[in-house]
Amino acid sequence: MHIRTRAALAALAAIAVAGGSAAAAAAQAAPHAPRQLTFVSRLTAIQFFTASGPVTGFPTTPLVPGDRIIGQDRILQNGKPAGHDNEICTVSFGRDVLCQDIVILTGQGDLQVSWTIQWPATGTRGPATFNGIIDGGTGRFATAHGTFHAATLPDGDMQITADLNAGQQ
């Protein structure tokens, strides 16, 4: 082998090793989504829209197919503000309500979640607990999929416990 060829191969090998080391370091430095995520969701705004127009406050009559609910919540982690969410729900048949939500965790990324609930025949609020799915996300949550459980706390806030990437290896 000529000296020039050996030098070129040595340079390529050095670049490959350096590149591999840099890629490994970047992979270790990249933040990963936690396996479990817990936060509190505190209602900050809600609006009901029916066929007759917007409703002030909570509805006093049953919701019907096509009615919409738009809400926003403040997200708290360990009692401190951590972001917010924007949700929209549509009433379907049989009082089934289909909801889509984007949870925005400041400096961490977003989660797209969805759920269905059964709106009560009487009363003004949805169920005290429900479950949903995590469809994906951005930032630390770019590969997130999983499920979550929501439970109403005594003060009216919702405790959300999410299991991310369950079943993935």
Task: Set out the residue ranges of the language-model regions.
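Hydrophobic alpha-helical segments
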Residues: 16, 24, 156-157
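Beta-strand-enriched cores of mature, soluble protein domains
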Residues: 30-169
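Sec-dependent N-terminal signal peptides
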Residues: 8-14
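C-terminal region of N-terminal signal peptides and the immediate post-cleavage residues
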Residues: 3-8, 19-35
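Long, low-complexity, intrinsically disordered polar/charged segments
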Residues: 1-2, 113
